[in-house]
């Protein structure tokens, strides 16, 4: 079973169970399973139950669409875990989750429509991934101690009020909202959103029995190697589990350490290039931002005297510099006279607890390659990487020495998916950071952010709490919007990448870490609190910036870029009546705006 929690390894137990099952009938297995559940309810200890689907238990009854609604699941094997608090509350974190290997433990199939559906298997990777040890399997119950307060022993049958439709695949084209997929409706195959939203409501209401039932169901259906719905269930369930056990930061440290062990320059390069090749998600912002920066620099060069021009880009983006080769080439070919000097200072931000050794190795290699490419293009070039740990608002911009060429140096600030790295708080930190960018007096500031409303209201408002409004209502609002956004992202990867792809798996794991951060961490600690274009535009205007419309040449470049990709991607300009009030352009997937690109000047 591709179980999300990875609390117990079922490999050895499965082999032993298979030998015992050869002489057992279908009914005897059902009776045994029911008896195990019944006997467990008579103990005083709290146990967490995890269901292991048997391929021989296939079914679900009848033809047509397969619904979970009031009927018992197929015959299956049940395993006892140690008392919940002992395993989940006090166990070392590497026992709660297998790092990022997510290797299948015993079953690789789920049953939809009463028939097995083969899941996507993890691709063979040239970079080995470690496997954390798992706690021992307990074959008998004990009555020692009370369990975790959130999970009391409960009947793990399917709740009778759930009516989930698996008859059609999920699609993000409908533009779902936070309230879509209400439990009880058909849902058009969006069973993950239905179950996850209901589970989030139960978590907010502290309904421990229903939480346990729903998490058991989700654990049965989730898989990081399945379809979009199974992946959403897998990653959001991991986030919910970390939230319930107050282990969000610990979980992120474990996932980050696993990613760090398996990160190299080659793997990073392959993933970035493959992502750009098959999806415009990142290259859309790169093309728009480069166009605005280049036009700004060329304006300076045209109006300047004969002295050598110096341009400096402050890159506040963790894009591994994939944006800059095309800009270097454009500077070399479009400069009328002497090629200007270009300096790039890139700030690589990371969470305080995240390992940075692998990223530092990658950035050293990137810097060497960038300098070599600039020499080939004939562009005088200087590259510097600054590694920053923690909140981007704590970065001392004045210490970066951005005017090494004196007052004649033209400065551009590039912010690609970086402003959300400023953690919301009571001191209006995001507004303050935008104001600090204004004090640099740049020629242009490019802002590219993913379009999602993942803050409760205005986390920087004076009336907000230090946690950014972490109430039950705020949690549900952010959870629902996160489902919408990451569903569209996963759907775009599903339709753009091959079924088996190491690069796609790496991107999905990155999204999984973002989901865990969003769901399990309070707003005051989360690095994934995206905002809408309207919010960012308001902040930039308040800081003293005015929007710069992209020229028709830049817009044509973006449209030409999108024609290289599969159908479903489109560009939408922000009109004057738009939420962004005429600032920038949007990248849309199946009519859903997902990425916003804009340019600003003082």
Curated annotation (Swiss-Prot):
Protein name as it appears in the record: Protein SHORT-ROOT 1
Leucine repeat II (LRII): annotated segments: 365-401
Annotated stretches, region: Disordered: 12-69, 101-145, 165-185
Stretches for region Leucine repeat I (LRI): 190-253
UniProt GO cellular component terms: nucleus
Organism whose genome encodes this protein: Oryza sativa subsp. indica (Rice)
Region feature PFYRE, mapped onto this chain: 411-517
Quaternary structure annotation from Swiss-Prot or TrEMBL: Interacts with SCR1.
Chain's gene name: SHR1
Chain positions covered by the region annotation VHIID: 272-349
Known role: Transcription factor required for the asymmetric cell division involved in radial pattern formation in roots. Essential for both cell division and cell specification.
Limits of the GRAS domain: 183-601
Motif VHIID in this chain: 311-315
Entry's family note: Belongs to the GRAS family.
Record keywords: Developmental protein, Nucleus, Transcription, Transcription regulation
Biased composition (Gly residues): 56-68, 173-185
Compositional bias annotation for Low complexity: 12-55, 103-145
């Amino acid at each position: 079973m591709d179980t999300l929690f990875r609390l117990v390894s079922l490999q050895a137990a499965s082999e032993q169970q298979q030998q015992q099952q050869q002489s057992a009938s279908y009914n005897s297995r059902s009776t045994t399973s029911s008896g195990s559940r019944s006997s467990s309810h008579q103990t005083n200890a709290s146990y967490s139950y995890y269901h292991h689907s048997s391929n021989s238990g296939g079914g679900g009854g009848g033809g047509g669409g397969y619904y979970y609604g009031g009927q018992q699941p197929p015959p299956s094997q049940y395993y006892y875990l140690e008392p919940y608090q002992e395993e989940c509350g006090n166990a070392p974190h590497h026992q709660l989750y297998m790092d990022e290997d997510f290797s299948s433990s015993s079953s690789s199939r789920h049953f939809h429509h009463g028939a097995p559906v083969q899941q996507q298997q993890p691709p063979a990777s040239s970079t080995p991934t470690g496997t954390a040890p798992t706690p021992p399997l307990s074959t008998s119950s004990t009555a020692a101690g009370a369990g975790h307060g959130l999970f009391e022993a409960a009947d793990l049958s399917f709740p009778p009020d759930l009516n989930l439709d698996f008859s059609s695949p999920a699609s993000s084209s409908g533009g779902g909202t936070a309230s879509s997929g209400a439990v009880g409706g058909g849902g058009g195959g969006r069973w993950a959103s239905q179950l996850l939203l209901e589970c989030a409501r139960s978590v907010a209401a502290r309904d421990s029995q229903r939480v346990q039932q729903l998490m058991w169901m989700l654990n049965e259906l989730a898989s990081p190697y399945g379809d979009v719905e199974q992946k959403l269930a897998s990653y959001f369930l991991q986030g919910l589990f970390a939230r319930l056990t107050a282990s969000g930061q610990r979980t992120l440290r474990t996932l980050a350490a696993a990613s760090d062990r398996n990160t190299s320059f080659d793997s990073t390069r392959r993933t970035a290039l493959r992502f750009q090749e098959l999806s415009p998600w990142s290259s859309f912002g790169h093309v728009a931002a480069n166009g605005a920066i280049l036009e700004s620099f060329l304006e300076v060069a045209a109006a300047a005297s004969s002295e050598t021009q110096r341009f400096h880009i402050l890159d506040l983006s963790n894009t591994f510099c994939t944006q800059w080769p095309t800009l270097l080439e454009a500077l070399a070919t479009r400069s009328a006279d002497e090629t200007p000097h270009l300096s790039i200072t890139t700030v690589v931000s990371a969470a305080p607890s995240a390992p940075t050794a692998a990223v530092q190795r990658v950035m050293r290699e990137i810097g060497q390659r960038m300098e070599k490419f600039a020499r080939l293009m004939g562009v005088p070039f200087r590259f510097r990487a600054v590694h920053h740990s923690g909140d981007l608002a704590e970065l001392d911009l004045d210490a970066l020495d951005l005017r090494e060429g004196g007052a004649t140096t033209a400065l551009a600030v590039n912010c690609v998916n970086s402003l959300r790295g400023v953690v919301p708080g009571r001191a209006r930190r995001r507004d303050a950071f935008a104001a600090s960018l204004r004090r640099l007096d740049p020629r242009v500031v490019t802002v590219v952010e993913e379009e999602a409303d993942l803050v409760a209201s205005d986390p920087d408002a004076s009336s907000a709490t230090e946690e950014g409004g972490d109430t039950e209502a705020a949690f549900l609002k952010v959870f629902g919007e996160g489902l919408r956004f990451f569903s569209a992202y996963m759907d775009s990867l599903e339709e753009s990448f091959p079924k088996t792809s190491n690069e796609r798996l790496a991107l999905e794991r990155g999204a999984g870490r973002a989901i865990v951060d969003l769901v399990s961490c309070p707003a005051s600690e989360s690095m994934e609190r995206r905002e809408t274009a309207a919010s960012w535009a308001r902040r930039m205007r308040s800081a003293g910036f005015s929007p710069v419309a992209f020229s028709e040449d830049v817009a044509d470049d973006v449209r030409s870029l999108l024609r290289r990709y599969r159908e479903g991607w489109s560009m939408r300009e922000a009109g004057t009546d738009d939420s962004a009030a005429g600032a920038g352009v949007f990248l849309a997937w199946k009519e859903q705006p997902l990425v916003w690109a804009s340019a600003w000047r003082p």
